[in-house]
Amino acid sequence: MSIVTVPSATSKVQQIKTLISVACTVNHLKQIHVSLINHHLHHDTFLVNLLLKRTLFFRQTKYSYLLFSHTQFPNIFLYNSLINGFVNNHLFHETLDLFLSIRKHGLYLHGFTFPLVLKACTRASSRKLGIDLHSLVVKCGFNHDVAAMTSLLSIYSGSGRLNDAHKLFDEIPDRSVVTWTALFSGYTTSGRHREAIDLFKKMVEMGVKPDSYFIVQVLSACVHVGDLDSGEWIVKYMEEMEMQKNSFVRTTLVNLYAKCGKMEKARSVFDSMVEKDIVTWSTMIQGYASNSFPKEGIELFLQMLQENLKPDQFSIVGFLSSCASLGALDLGEWGISLIDRHEFLTNLFMANALIDMYAKCGAMARGFEVFKEMKEKDIVIMNAAISGLAKNGHVKLSFAVFGQTEKLGISPDGSTFLGLLCGCVHAGLIQDGLRFFNAISCVYALKRTVEHYGCMVDLWGRAGMLDDAYRLICDMPMRPNAIVWGALLSGCRLVKDTQLAETVLKELIALEPWNAGNYVQLSNIYSVGGRWDEAAEVRDMMNKKGMKKIPGYSWIELEGKVHEFLADDKSHPLSDKIYAKLEDLGNEMRLMGFVPTTEFVFFDVEEEEKERVLGYHSEKLAVALGLISTDHGQVIRVVKNLRVCGDCHEVMKLISKITRREIVVRDNNRFHCFTNGSCSCNDYW
């Protein structure tokens, strides 16, 4: 039996209206529709409109359109109801078809129509049509309608026509926060974040209070330009206005502090959040990774898993980046196991992080397998493979990948050639390096960067051709930076040209007056040359400026745990065994005729003390732990935050020969693969 019974004619319209309002299923609505037809009311636009709105409430867009199309003379209100339903259900092209039907039938346009149609133009990528509607809006007398004009403003902003958008903005009376947001979005979409921030400040000065959505958007603009001052001004404004900081606002604040390197503040905001979603955790983890806090990034990732949150692509990438920084290969591979491998192979963002991790852990053979398995590749992935192969000594293979890039129709960029040139530097391939360097501008019409010049200086310096290297620096179209001068300094070390090294270090000190390492190296050059007074002057200058040498840290991963060492570090539980192992190795090296190279320690330290300090540099302690904790034949992988000193480099070669172990050390410049008494860098780094 039907639940719908339409009574006498005098009250049936009112009762149908009531039945429509209380209908709780689509079947109820269909029964009402049947009753309308039976009582010849299916052309009553008022009742049909009520029924249509109710069907749209249940997202029955096809049935709604059926009701509409069977109405003999649909009016503008019926059109507006269906247009509103279509827009809310993301049927933007269908919305535009309805609008064209309105125009075809010559119906009077309602102020409610334009905002919806203009929104559909934006979402259907029909902005040209939206701009064309501007004259119609004016013609129909809606040029003072805030909703219609704000929708037009969104069209102009989204099209990048910001001058026109601003003119329109100035014409709108009683601008609401929605109007300001529309113009603001245009600036951010066009990458003009600084102007967007200034617009927000102007809005606040005019007494318009932003909503939380706007706050998130302006904080995101601050993130893009690294504007911490404006970000903190916004936070202060929110506190003065007693605005609540929801999770979106707080997460964006975490992102801002992380972008600006203020990790303590980022963590403070993070810890203050009662509820954190995966986006918040990922933001904090990536912040640690990008600000050189890899241990904290890994710890937070593990804590996130304890909260039963499934990692997303951003948290995984942050975790892998942290593992890459520490050379924590086993830990990284454990993290990979948390995500389906197919997802890595189809997600370019994650695949890039995975290849980068393998490359930085000295396991590029595994990274290259990932690269080969990927069906789709872009220039970022190609560059990751080229750079990873080159830095791990597989230079010819990196050239082959470059050839594959061209065959796939992928255009190389500056990073592509940077990877290729790094490979040429590490392998000493001068002619190949010159070929790639010239191809950057002559073949591919790309602009050479200071990093490209730095590689060429490094290449000449490696060959001992310091005159060519220095000439290239003088001919550079831009001012040489610390990378370029540092490359020349490496060449000076190779040929022991202390005079040029002194000149280079003075340039480095001028560029990086805060870098204590440059002062230390200059002091050591003076001391080696017997220029004690000048060496003392440099040290006095350091003391007056309160400068201290950056401590050298080394890390080694064993069974998923990262162990950290400083020079002369005795904090490790196995310190006694570590030092005993180094003592045994030292005795064997002395029997082989090895004498420590004490020039790598400050000159004002006694010779015996110099040898003791050198003997316990952080990388030696890490290697010793690896030797006593792993099986014979297992590769030992160590990461150091600074350049490996000359003495440690010689010691590593001898240890690899004595123990018959492969030792891979990644310093802040390159990989060193020590095997059977030799290093892959050929003693140039």
Swiss-Prot record:
UniProt repeat feature PPR, residue ranges: 75-109, 110-144, 145-175, 176-210, 211-245, 246-276, 277-311, 312-346, 347-381, 383-412, 413-443, 449-479
UniProt gene name: PCMP-H84
UniProt record, GO biological process: RNA modification
Sorted UniProt keywords: Repeat
Family that this chain belongs to: Belongs to the PPR family. PCMP-H subfamily.
Keyword Nucleus carried by entry: no
Region (Type E motif): 484-559
Keyword Repeat: yes
Region (Type E(+) motif): 560-590
Name of the protein in its database record: Putative pentatricopeptide repeat-containing protein At3g08820
Annotated S-S bridges: none
Gene3D superfamilies for this protein: Tetratricopeptide repeat domain
Chain ranges passing through the membrane: none
Region named Type DYW motif: 591-685
SUPFAM superfamilies, alphabetized: HCP-like (SSF81901)
InterPro entries tied to this protein: DYW_dom, E_motif, Eplus_motif, Pentatricopeptide_rpt, PPR_At4g14850-like_plant, TPR-like_helical_dom_sf
One term of GO molecular function: RNA binding
